[in-house]
């Protein structure tokens, strides 16, 4: 049928004559006429192709014989060959290993090969693609002992052979060939998939060999010429068959109720032709085999009712979860705590009570929902009105401010009443809230309770009667009220009284001036932090007054404006007289301040001016008229 296969010895013998003919043409030179070339072609075109071996002439005229042999070699070598150089070049092209044994996949499809050869070095192949070629035989695969997948579809194969070395072959594709009989496959112990679509299979005998393929699971026999319904007996004897494709065969029309029959007879089949075999389809097919179409209809109705019940139960479970969530939300809005067992009172459908596994699943779902809501309530507690949070804010404001003013109390020797003063702005800013009235009432009680503490300390520091203390504390009250207004006479009167009394009681008067600010009305302190700054400035002034003596008072600073610049320049300025000269601490009351002017007090003018400017911001306006007031008093 194929005479070319038996002619390679003749080709090897004719190679010298081919070289001679080439030499003859080489000697002929370029002067050969086109007519001669056409004549030689005509002589080799017809019967020369078939009768050239028998027409050997001993006369030495080898021209026509050489051309006939060359044309035959061209015809045989017309297609590409699977050479080692070609395979190595192909591996480089596909970025595979240059070392043949390291490659596990070789892509040789769509190359036009007519035979399998030169694969001895590729011992590590696991997948070999040879589809869409002109291969006529399965051969030269002895070195591929590790091969798992062999793809030989769309070739010119007529027989299944030479597969014994492939002991690990798992998938074999022989579709679109000219195979008429399935054979020589029992030597493949682990063959799982066999594709024989578009071949020449016709009878039961053609597929009888499949009984010996015990591990075959996927079988594709589509688009063959199988017409005998007895093929089901062969397929039924295959224990591991799961997927079967018989589409395109006449047998599908010859078997009555084809799909039901095949499903019933092949017990383990899960996929038939173009769609799966579902458990419902198998149950209906078995019911049809028992009682016909009526039994099949009843079985189908039962399956549909069970499926509908599953869907209904799922929807009811979702609705129950939603309903419980709404009930919990309503209970939280009402301020109630929902009981964890309250959900159990929700009635369930009688169908759900009949089936115990479904009831257990519902119980698990209910328990999960309850635990989820309890965890949410613990992590994110909700207050119904928010009054507790408001109360905490007010209390925190009252607690933090005493810590702020505690630094001021640490620097001062007397007991400080400023915590109540520092809390009063907080209460004023939070007046729009509901708990402000109670907070203000508590602060007022605290003020009334601590009101007498500065007087008691003054009484311990100086042996003065209670009436004198009342007088001393009353005068700074007038001063605190008038200092916030414009230039007022009570302030000037207090200044004159302080100049006339250079005794330690003046210091106590200054201390009482500190605490007298808190006894005034809360409306007088327009700026929130002025009452904190005043005691600090007054304390600095007192420390300077104690170091420099009682003589460093306001009238001395006022008399500096009356002294001429010449006398101030002539007098020396010893810094030691501030603490040594006792006469300077008691200025005369007759107004003769020029003769008793202390020069040492000039050193403390800057510090005292800064302290007075911080305590009394409007005092410079009063100093303008102090000179006239002094002369008026004289």
From Swiss-Prot:
Query: Which residues are annotated as modified residue Phosphoserine in the UniProt record?
Result: 349, 465, 488
Q: Which GO terms describe its molecular function?
A: dynein complex binding
Phosphothreonine-modified residues are: 462
Subcellular location, in the record's words? Answer: Cell projection, Cilium
The record's section on InterPro entries has: Cilia_flagella_integrity, Leu-rich_rpt, LRR_dom_sf
- Chief location: other
Stretches assigned to the LRRCT domain: 249-288
Composition-biased stretches, type Basic and acidic residues, lie in 22-42, 70-80, 326-336
Pfam families for the chain: LRR_9
Keyword entries, A-Z: Cell projection, Cilium, Leucine-rich repeat, Phosphoprotein, Repeat
Q: Where is the composition biased (Polar residues)?
A: 48-62
Q: Which domain of life is it from?
A: Eukaryota
Which positions are tagged coiled coil? Answer: none
Instruction: State a GO cellular component annotated for this protein.
Output: axoneme
Identify the stretches annotated as LRR repeats. Answer: 101-123, 124-145, 146-167, 168-189, 190-211, 215-236
Sorted alphabetically, the Gene Ontology BP terms of this entry are: cilium assembly; cilium movement; determination of digestive tract left/right asymmetry; determination of liver left/right asymmetry; determination of pancreatic left/right asymmetry; heart looping; inner dynein arm assembly; lung development
Q: Where is this region: Disordered?
A: 1-80, 326-358, 481-505, 559-634
PANTHER family in UniProt: DYNEIN AXONEMAL ASSEMBLY FACTOR 1, PROTEIN PHOSPHATASE 1 REGULATORY SUBUNIT SDS22-RELATED
What this chain does, per the entry, is described as: Cilium-specific protein required for the stability of the ciliary architecture. Plays a role in cytoplasmic preassembly of dynein arms. Involved in regulation of microtubule-based cilia and actin-based brush border microvilli.
The family annotation for this protein states: Belongs to the DNAAF1 family.
Name of the protein described by the UniProt record: Dynein axonemal assembly factor 1
Species assigned in the record: Mus musculus (Mouse)
Which lineage do the record's taxonomy fields give for this organism? Eukaryota, Metazoa, Chordata, Craniata, Vertebrata
- What gene codes for this chain? Dnaaf1
């Amino acid at each position: 049928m194929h005479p070319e296969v038996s002619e390679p010895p003749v080709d090897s013998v004719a190679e010298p004559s081919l070289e001679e003919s080439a030499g003859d043409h080489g000697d002929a030179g370029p002067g050969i006429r086109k007519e001669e070339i056409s004549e030689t072609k005509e002589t080799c075109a017809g019967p020369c192709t078939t009768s050239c071996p028998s027409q050997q002439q001993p006369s030495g005229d080898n021209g026509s014989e050489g051309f006939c042999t060359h044309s035959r070699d061209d015809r045989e070598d017309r297609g590409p060959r699977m050479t080692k150089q070609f395979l190595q070049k192909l591996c480089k092209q596909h970025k595979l290993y240059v070392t043949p044994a390291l490659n596990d996949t070789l892509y040789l499809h769509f190359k036009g090969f007519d035979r399998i050869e030169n694969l001895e070095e590729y011992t590590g192949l696991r997948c070999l693609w040879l589809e869409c070629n002109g291969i006529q035989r399965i051969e030269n695969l002895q070195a591929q002992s590790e091969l798992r997948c062999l793809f030989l579809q769309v070739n010119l194969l007529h027989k299944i052979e030479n597969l014994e070395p492939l002991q690990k072959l798992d998938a074999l594709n022989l579709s679109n060939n000219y195979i008429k009989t399935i054979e020589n496959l029992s030597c493949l112990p682990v063959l799982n998939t066999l594709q024989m679509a578009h071949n020449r299979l016709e009878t039961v005998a053609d597929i009888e060999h499949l009984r010996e393929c015990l591990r075959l699971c996927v079988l594709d026999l589509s688009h063959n010429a199988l017409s005998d319904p007895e093929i089901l007996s062969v397929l039924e004897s295959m224990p591991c068959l799961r997927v079967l494709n018989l589409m395109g065969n006449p047998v599908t029309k010859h078997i009555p109720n084809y799909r039901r029959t095949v499903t019933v007879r092949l017990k383990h089949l899960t996929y038939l032709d173009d769609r799966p075999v579902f458990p419902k389809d198998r149950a209906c097919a078995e019911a049809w085999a028992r009682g016909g179409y009526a039994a099949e209809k009843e079985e189908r109705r039962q399956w549909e009712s069970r499926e509908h019940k599953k869907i209904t139960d799922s929807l009811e479970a979702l609705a129950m979860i939603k309903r419980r969530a709404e009930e919990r939300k309503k209970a939280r809005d009402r301020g109630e705590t929902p009981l964890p067992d309250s959900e159990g009172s929700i009635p369930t459908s009688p169908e759900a009570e009949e089936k115990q596994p479904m009831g257990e699943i519902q119980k698990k779902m209910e328990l999960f929902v309850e635990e989820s809501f309890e965890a949410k309530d613990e992590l994110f507690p909700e207050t119904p009105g928010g009054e507790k949070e408001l109360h905490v804010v007010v209390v925190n404001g009252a607690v933090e401010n005493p810590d702020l003013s505690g630094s001021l109390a640490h620097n001062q020797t007397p007991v400080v009443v400023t915590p109540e003063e520092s809390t009063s702005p907080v209460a004023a800013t939070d007046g729009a809230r509901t708990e402000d009235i109670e907070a203000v009432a508590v602060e007022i009680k605290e003020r009334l309770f601590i009101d007498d503490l500065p007087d008691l300390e003054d009484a311990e520091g100086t042996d003065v009667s209670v009436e004198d203390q009342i007088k001393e504390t009353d005068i700074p009250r007038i001063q605190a009220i008038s200092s916030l207004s414009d230039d007022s006479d009570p302030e000037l009167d207090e200044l004159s009284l302080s100049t006339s009394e250079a005794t330690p009681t003046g210091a106590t008067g200054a201390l009482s001036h500190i605490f007298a600010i808190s006894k005034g009305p809360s409306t007088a302190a327009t700026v929130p932090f002025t009452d904190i700054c005043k005691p600090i400035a007054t304390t600095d002034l007192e420390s300077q007054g104690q170091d420099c003596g009682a003589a460093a008072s306001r009238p001395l600073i006022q008399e500096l404006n009356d002294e001429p610049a010449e006398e101030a320049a002539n007098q020396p300025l010893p810094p030691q007289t501030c603490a040594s000269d006792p006469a300077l601490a008691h200025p005369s009351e007759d107004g003769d301040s020029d003769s008793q002017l202390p020069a040492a007090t000039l050193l403390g003018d800057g510090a005292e001016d800064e302290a007075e400017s911080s305590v009394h911001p409007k005092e410079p306006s009063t100093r303008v008229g102090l000179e006239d007031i002094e002369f008026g008093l004289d």
